């Protein structure tokens, strides 16, 4: 039964903590009193107040008919007859009986008949019928009394429909009264109530884990929103949820310290969904619990990854198919953290070692993997986390080939390995190395293109990071391949084929083709790379390019020049640099001769002890130093250079004549060999033709003989026939 008014006439709260009120049965419209139970109650107070402030302020004024009431009803009679006596709001006045003979019984709340207040809800009726059928089956199967863990008032009959309740002896217990508050935003006014804390029982009519009126855990499923106490079946405890120590706390209490979750909504009726309150403070125990939960998640994720990399493919595939999506996503997130965190590199290496130890990971077995399982295996082995994201879709067969190092792990390349069947030491010694997109020094790849930061070999097409080449001294001065003998230029020494590729022309081609499309930051990076490459250059072109790149970088950083103008200046410089003559290094002989002449001139100066002599000696020394740069010294240097070049020219002429003689000898020898081979070839062809003609002649002779023999035989046969014809004619005549 639901009390329609819970306040006294003067508007104040009716509160009795020490008295023992006795509740009588509800007087129904049919005036049927089957049985009456007297119930004992201690300290049950009903407070109905209106709140003008949601922040916790309460007033003593209330409206008896307002929708902000919290009403409680207790069942005394048959639950089937209760629905007929209820009004449209399901409320009746509670009457008290002073002379009831049953003091040891408490009335259990009616959690089912109130659902009849919305007869148009077919979904609610269907749920009620299903739950009632389940209750009947449970009662038939379980004849014993359930464990007393109920939220219902003490000493209540376990059956809602029992007409004769068995008396139980009164047990005097000291019960603690707890005050509970609610700031439920779905109700129109906050409420406050006093309730006892009783042991809980798994009673399906009032469960801590199930709502008493609706067994559907989804909040907001029903279409009717109940106000105040309506829709909660008069249950104060339906507004509460359990906490760790088994006590009762407000469901929306902001200082409870426990964050709301989807599981908490199962304690609220679907007609009156509760919003979780804002958390104000979090206790130290809660922080410890959160930390422990995070540690447990990490341990569980690590265990999942270890099972994936160590256990058989088929068993893990079955496990993953039955695994929750949250667990699998947590394992992937843990693996992403392993890849991103350098301090956790050892754990990632251990997982990779587990994979390397396995011998059953073939193409056939890996084809039986689940997609998520194969993604994790590939991500662990390659150390790349983008295989774990669902944005990149790679076919299963390509993932298997990437795992087995048969295909490039760069998703922008994915070339079959080795590229172009390369057999160099880099491609053969490094599994999974792709010469199209990976650096042979650091074995890494990136998506950079049309840039000077990647340097390529002219022969084997291996590409290397310019920074790696400078660090490993692969980009250094070398003898020029196109210029004069004795000149040097910056070269890239390929470690794959040991070929030398010149850098000046490569940088020029890149700037001419791509510089106009670069922005400010890109142009600064490219010029900085060029500056680093040509920093140790010895030739005039390289030094000039280094200075020009340094100048352009400073101007671009200070925004003295636009990127387009800077790129035009660099391109003009490359065109101008082609006309710069390559000056060879000064010959060692010339340097030695100059040093010797200077020492002789210096030795010819006689020292003097007087000041004048010293001044003269200093002046003479200065004159000697200046005379080294005079015209005579330049003439001597030029003469020495002329003699040196003449000597080299004579040597070159002699060498050229020797090469010419060798060529003539080789030519004569080749002509003789050619003539002999041609004659031999002609003789063989003639003999072959003669042999073919003889065979044809023999065939003709044989055919002629056969024809002659056949002709003679036919003539003989014809002559015999004529003779017989003549004889026959004579006989007839």
Swiss-Prot record:
Region (Disordered): 1-42, 118-142, 592-614
Taxonomic superkingdom: Eukaryota
InterPro entries reported in the protein's UniProt record: OBE1-like_PHD, OBERON, Oberon-like_PHD, Oberon_cc
GO MF term set: zinc ion binding
Pfam families hit by this protein: Oberon_cc, PHD_Oberon
Predominant cellular place of this UniProt entry's protein: nucleus
CC terms in the record's Gene Ontology section: nucleus
Deletion consequences: No visible phenotype under normal growth conditions, but the double mutants tta1 and tta2 exhibit a rootless phenotype and seedling lethality. No visible phenotype under normal growth conditions, but the double mutants obe3-2 and obe4-2 exhibit broad growth defects and developmental arrest of seedlings.
UniProt keyword Transcription, yes or no: yes
Biased composition (Polar residues): 21-30
Signal peptide: none
Keywords linked to the UniProt accession: Coiled coil, Metal-binding, Nucleus, Transcription, Transcription regulation, Zinc, Zinc-finger
Coiled coil: 120-153, 644-733
Gene Ontology biological-process entries: cell fate specification; embryonic meristem initiation; embryonic pattern specification; inorganic cation import across plasma membrane
Zinc finger (PHD-type): 436-500
Basic and acidic residues bias spans: 1-15
Compartment(s) where it occurs, according to its Swiss-Prot or TrEMBL record: Nucleus
Function recorded in the entry: Probable transcription factor that functions redundantly with OBE4 in specification of the hypophysis and establishment of the embryonic root. Involved in the activation of ARF5/MP-dependent gene expression during embryonic root meristem initiation. Involved in shoot meristem homeostasis.
PANTHER family noted in UniProt: PROTEIN OBERON 3, VERNALIZATION-INSENSITIVE PROTEIN 3
Self-association and partners: Self-interacts. Interacts with OBE1 and OBE2. Interacts with OBE4.
Name listed for the protein in its UniProt record: Protein OBERON 3
Taxonomic source organism: Arabidopsis thaliana (Mouse-ear cress)
Organism lineage string: Eukaryota, Viridiplantae, Streptophyta, Embryophyta, Tracheophyta
